[in-house]
Amino acid sequence: MDEFLVWKDWWTQKYRFEIGEGVRYFSMKTALNIFHQRKGLNIVETGTIRALNDAAGGGNSTVLFGDYAQVYDKKFWTVDILPEAIALSKTVTEGYNKNTTFVTSDSLIFLKDFKEPIDLLYLDS
């Protein structure tokens, strides 16, 4: 599925206007393009989504990574110290989180103990 590498792919059509065409969109698309080209497997996000419908303010990286991971059969971990944030994350990503692992933990402890190689690390905690 190398159509992700072009600018009119499914991800761009779905998220370009939802998260805005500013720096946030282009930096996220660039990071995922590099991950995709290098045939990455594991994405780890520290700090999960904490508000509904906050694409403009928060960027919704949890949603973006979860959707990407499901489409391309990658592994995605989202880590947050707050149980209520993890609960919200599970709700918001319902329908495209089969490749997502939700972890309630301090991110420093999680990263120290994580045994898999991390191909894309998104620090948002």
Predicted regions and their residues:
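A short alpha-helical cap/connector motif
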Residues: 1-125
